[in-house]
Amino acid sequence: MNINKKRIAIVLFNLGGPDSLKSVKPFLFNLFYDKAIINLPNPLRYIIAKLISTTREKKSQKIYSLIGGKSPLLEETEKQKLALAENLKQATNEDFNIFINMRYASPKIEETIKQIKEYNPTEVILLPLYPQFSTTTTGSSVKNFLSNFNINIPVKVVCCYPVEENFIKAHTALIKEKIFDKNSRVLFSAHGLPQKIIDAGDPYSFQVEETVKAVVKELNIKDLDYKVTYQSRVGPVEWLKPNTEDEIEIAGKQNKNIIIVPIAFVSEHVETLVELDIEYKLIADKYKIKYNRTPTLSTNKIFIKSLTSILLKFINKKEDDFLVASSNGERICPDKFSKCLCFTSFPPMRESSK
């Protein structure tokens, strides 16, 4: 037995989703009760989360009924976990186990940490299934994990991987399969955020744009017609622009065919299967233009290779306490993005995320 052999707990973070129509309301409440989503003190945040989850329940249930009455996100993540484990077994001699933590649904933080404690690791690596960092996604999940994790072992956090080589190549390969003529416009659609979150120093839109720049460069298609757009806008506040729906309308009026690339989603879920595939397609159908979408990266071999490569870098990093870095081991965000997780010099373990 090699006493120096590591035991590594790898935690995959994602949003989560309802596993039945009955669980839609509690899922919505958990989402909007997160301080990273609605930054208001209690009891106001609690009241608003209750109000939103109640008023949106029936509409959201109708949406989920279109895809079998539940979110496919956990099942998708389980498949990614298995593919990643298979790759990693071939690449490292270290002992490891992969766990899943969903921020707003099961398996929630208590369940995940219980499983990790039973495994008894020597270190933990946190890997978000959000390629681009935001305080509302990776930031919230990391904070939630660290504020509940009380084992004194090294924790390594993968902040983001917006321009990781194989992540970019995976997208590029899928786009090349879908480009059907020179009259196509590629819309790189990412989940939107309120503009005020970006203005407060969140690097999300910067990282989305860096991803798109890298993909376009890798595509190497002369005079490629493309735009970065944002979807899923809700409420009266100003959101990131341009809006994906609006850009499909514009393309329709210009008789431009559309290729949608879900550039910030790595798993199929309600925003891709309903919003992109059904709701937005209706806009294209109205103008009788061709509408196509690349699949999410899911278990794409090049994408799994990307995640494997990232993990190997972090497995091989010597760290006695706490590490947070992008996939290349450094901070990639300019200093003006003060909410970048890589500015964190110590683990915020005692700061409440609730």
Curated annotation (Swiss-Prot):
CDD domains tied to this protein: Ferrochelatase_C (cd00419), Ferrochelatase_N (cd03411)
Pathway(s) it belongs to: Porphyrin-containing compound metabolism; protoheme biosynthesis; protoheme from protoporphyrin-IX: step 1/1
SUPFAM superfamilies: Chelatase
GO biological process, one term: heme biosynthetic process
PROSITE patterns: FERROCHELATASE (PS00534)
EC number: 4.98.1.1
UniProt keyword annotations, A-Z: Cytoplasm, Heme biosynthesis, Iron, Lyase, Metal-binding, Porphyrin biosynthesis
Catalyzed reactions per annotation: heme b + 2 H(+) = protoporphyrin IX + Fe(2+)
Positions of Fe cation binding: H191, E271
Main location (coarse class): cytoplasm
Gene Ontology CC terms, in alphabetical order: cytoplasm
Pfam families found in the cross-reference section: Ferrochelatase
Coiled-coil residues: none
GO molecular function terms attached to this record: ferrochelatase activity; metal ion binding
Cell compartments where the protein resides: Cytoplasm
Signal peptide positions on this chain: none
NCBIfam families: hemH
Role: Catalyzes the ferrous insertion into protoporphyrin IX.
Similarity remark: Belongs to the ferrochelatase family.
Record's protein name: Ferrochelatase
Protein's organism: Rickettsia bellii (strain OSU 85-389)
